[in-house]
Amino acid sequence: MDLYSELTAKYQTVPAIATEIINLEAILNLPKPTEAFMSDIHGEYNAFQHVLRNGSGNVKSKIRSCFRDEMTEATLQRFAFLVYYPSERMAAIHREMAGDDLQQWYLTTFRRLIRLLAFTATKYTRSKVRKAMAPEFVYITEELLYNDADTPDKLAYYWQIIRNLIVLEQADQWIAATCQTIQRLTVDHFHVVGDIYDRGPAPDQVVESLIRRDRRHSVDIQWGNHDILWIGGAAGSALCIANLVRISARYNNLSILEDVYGINLRHLARLAEQYYQDNPAFSPKMERSDRPITEAERLQITQIHQAIAMIQFKLEGPVIKRRPEFDMDHRLVLEKLAPDFSTIKLNGDTYTIENGCFATVDPADPYKLLPEEQEVIDSLVESFTHSEKLHRHMDFLLDHGSMYLRYNRNLLLHGCVPVDEDGNFIGLTIKGTTYTGRQLFDMLEANLRLAYSQPTENADLATDLMWYLWTGPNSPLFGKHDMTTFERYFISDPKAHVEGRNPYYHLRKDPEFIKKILAEFVLDPEVGHVINGHTPVKKGTDPIMANNKMIVIDGGFSKPYQKTTGIGGYTLLDNSYGMQLVTHQPFTTKADAITNLTDIISTRRVVETEARRRTVAETDIGTELQDEVEVLKRRLGELREED
């Protein structure tokens, strides 16, 4: 049904049409809602949750603006943490207070929350504010929010509502619900610019959090290369599965596979114990003091790590050979090993192999899987394609995700737009058609969706392209020429570890190059920005480039990268006043944050300031509403002519 038919069916009379025109044109003049951007969460659920709850620091900013000089800094901090963590902070209040002190706390807190809610809701319609409220408290909250308690006729009414909330033991529930409403209204739309998965301990909880938030909130995702592995795993790609299991072993996260997603690792553990011993190159990274393991567990993970890595290297061979268009023959590493596995020849140089573990590799046929290895990968594919929870999470990533997003004049993408040294777009030639620039992204996304819809087809081009997205030389999500996983395990010479970044990463400092990218994706080069994740911003490197047109927001949610970045992540805020880049300190623990009121915002930096406040009319949603207004005005004219 086209827009005209849809609207004329919904609004059939002159008063109905006129009322809707008035409503829409009023909305168009409201201030632009706030967007928040974050990337490279990598399973760090608690840090991610903290940023969601504090709205990238926006909640505290709202409190400061609302109450100005009425609160000391300590009082403001306590109130802010009540809004962030209402249930946990109220539990602490109940331990500290009772009787009249608790009653007074309730009365003071109710007044403050209503004031803050009113302040936060000013740029939204009543309808939108209502949708952000907990359904069970909508009536009570609206009565408190929209009634003037200073009016004598309403004063008793107002205070009776508050007293009854306390007497009927609903005060804690109302406070929690109102704090959550404030959180939702503080940031209207969240963009996750890739890499929810891998390294950290709880990517599943990050996805569950986004699912919950999306029920009343606006969320989108631009897939990262690590996310692709998990989507590919659910789609039945043996290579994606081997890679993500290897990474899970490397970061001591196999419990995510077994306990969260129900993936059967018994066959793999049995194979690993049979063929592999201890090996320092494959010992799991112990980045987290809160997740200790026994020596027996460490040995088992080390063995599993080796077993799945060998399966991965073997699986790569047939795909590279059947897809010459991928141009990846240089990654056929197993056949470059000496027959005794003591050395390997790469790019004309011979390197000594260290910590080798090639017991299952036949020098005469290096990519051939042992029957036991084939059994392992078949079992894993079966488990991944039949995991109900994994598919529910990947369905969400598919429904809310894309390779890139054009949103409110900005381009959001995780990795890069592949180019050569001169900035010319490069890509892939598939079946005689060359795809570069935006067409490359669109082709790869179409194939990803096709592969996901056909999990029993796992040797087709669409499935192979999912693996290419992870590691291919011209993959927009990888952005390097080589993924030197093999070399990093077995060769100590750093020369062999070089992966070779795409020229995009040094060209993106040039404003003219960014304008070219924006034009390629049909965005206004003069006002648009590119918002990028994927590459951690090292200490001393500016995340804002190209005269403020390129903004990189991977600052180190992932704990292993915090040594490189020196911070705990970036988020970007875009509201009616302009754009701000928020720098976060490393997150410690949720318990520390709640007990010690430890926030993680360190600095805010203005990226761009609007000459005047932007309105809804200047957003993508505003364009849609303006189209509706035009259709309704046309229909209004038709009805008046009929009269």
From Swiss-Prot:
Family: Belongs to the FBPase class 3 family.
HAMAP family registered for this protein in UniProt: FBPase_class3 (MF_01854)
Pfam families the UniProt entry points to: FBPase_2
Record keywords: Carbohydrate metabolism, Hydrolase, Manganese
InterPro entries according to UniProt: FBPtase_class3, Metallo-depent_PP-like
Catalyzed reaction equations: beta-D-fructose 1,6-bisphosphate + H2O = beta-D-fructose 6-phosphate + phosphate
Species name: Lacticaseibacillus paracasei (strain ATCC 334 / BCRC 17002 / CCUG 31169 / CIP 107868 / KCTC 3260 / NRRL B-441) (Lactobacillus paracasei)
SUPFAM superfamilies noted in UniProt: Metallo-dependent phosphatases (SSF56300)
A GO molecular-function descriptor: fructose 1,6-bisphosphate 1-phosphatase activity
Enzyme's top EC category: hydrolase
Cofactor (UniProt): Mn(2+)
EC number: 3.1.3.11
Protein's recorded name: Fructose-1,6-bisphosphatase class 3
GO biological process: gluconeogenesis
